[in-house]
């Protein structure tokens, strides 16, 4: 029997690989001759970098960069030597959790560009970048400035930083690093489909949670529109209505227009990066899971992405979770053949989330399930 295990992290309890290895221990206790392949799993959001570093034996690279409000922050990325790939989350450089401030008119993505530039300096040319959790609404201008682009006002001077700069931009000077950047492959984990501007765009949908007040909304959106129009003239591309252009305060748009980036649903991108599909081609059973299995899981979260891949090759898919809601039955229709909560007996949330307890529960549940297979 061949089993492929790809379990998302149980936040505050087990990392993806810890959960996966606990499942493996349980399977082998029941089926000593089973071939069990454990792969890291993430959805492109928080924790993706750590999951891939641990699961693919990558290297963590710490870098001091410019934070969203121009203060130095400690960011990092993962280096996957085998594929010469950097894995990073923009939130480590320009995330909303880095500061108590919420000032989108000045918040910048400059540090994201610095992080990319550091990786390029090491000879890295392939990038997987998660762009969730941003504090910014600058259209990615800060990032592009760090990468050598110049955004100029009507006087031919620097237009400034943050959302306030967008309305001032009248021209763009192409980066002196353009040839170097053209050698890079940017794959962006993006699960939102919002355009750049308008009522469903970056500013109106995500701006309020970043501190954009009602009176500033139309001002910032108009600035974003101006930036898009200037960009279209410079790049001969008009991606302002592309799905995901409005992600991370317009960072998705910057990747599309200036860096030829590819926006891909996070789970699809990660499954490709860890080569799960290759292992599933001859798998008998697939095991996945996450901390809580619910209706949102069925709507396309990581475990369902794994299940769909398993179905493609005729494998049965089992999911384990810390808790399972009534609405989780929707996961059966989404491709998960059967799911099981791992908590054994009455316990407090704190007890259930204890890492040692969670691993023991995971292994024990997996063992009992696989005794039937």
For the regions a language model picked out, list residue spans one by one.
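N-terminal loops that bind phosphate or other acidic moieties
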Residues: 1-131, 135-373
């Amino acid at each position: 029997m061949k089993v492929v295990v790809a379990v998302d992290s149980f936040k505050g309890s087990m990392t993806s690989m810890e959960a996966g290895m606990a499942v493996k221990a349980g399977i082998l206790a029941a089926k000593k001759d089973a071939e069990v392949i454990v792969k890291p799993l993430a959805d492109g959001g928080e924790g993706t970098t750590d999951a891939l570093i641990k699961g693919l034996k990558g290297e963590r690279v710490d870098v001091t960069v410019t934070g969203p409000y121009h203060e130095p922050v400690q960011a990092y990325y993962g280096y996957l030597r085998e594929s010469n790939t950097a894995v990073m989350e923009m939130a480590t450089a320009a995330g909303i959790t880095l500061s108590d401030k919420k000032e989108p008119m000045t918040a910048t993505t400059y540090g994201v560009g610095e992080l990319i530039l550091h990786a390029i300096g090491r000879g890295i040319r392939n990038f997987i970048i998660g762009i969730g959790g941003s504090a910014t609404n600058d259209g990615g201008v800060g990032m592009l400035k760090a990468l050598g682009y110049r955004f100029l006002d009507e006087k031919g001077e620097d237009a400034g930083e943050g959302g306030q700069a967008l309305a001032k931009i009248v021209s763009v000077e192409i980066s002196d690093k353009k040839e170097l950047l053209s050698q890079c492959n940017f794959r962006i984990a993006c699960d939102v489909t919002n355009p750049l501007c308008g009522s469903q765009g970056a500013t109106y949908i995500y701006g309020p949670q970043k501190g954009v007040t009602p009176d500033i909304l139309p001002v910032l959106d108009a600035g974003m529109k101006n930036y898009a129009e200037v960009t279209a003239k410079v790049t001969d591309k008009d991606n302002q209505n592309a799905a995901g252009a409005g992600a991370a305060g317009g960072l998705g748009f910057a990747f599309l227009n200036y860096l030829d980036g590819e926006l891909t649903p996070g789970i699809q991108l990660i499954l490709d990066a860890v080569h799960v599909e290759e292992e599933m081609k001859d798998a008998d059973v697939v095991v996945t899971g996450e901390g809580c299995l619910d209706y949102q899981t069925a709507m396309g979260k990581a475990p369902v992405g794994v299940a769909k891949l398993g179905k493609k090759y005729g494998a049965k898919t089992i999911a384990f979770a810390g808790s399972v809601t009534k609405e989780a039955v929707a996961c059966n229709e989404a491709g998960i053949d059967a799911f099981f909560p791992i908590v054994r007996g009455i316990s407090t949330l704190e007890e259930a989330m204890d890492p040692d307890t969670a691993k023991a529960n995971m292994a024990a549940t997996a063992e009992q399930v696989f005794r039937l297979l």
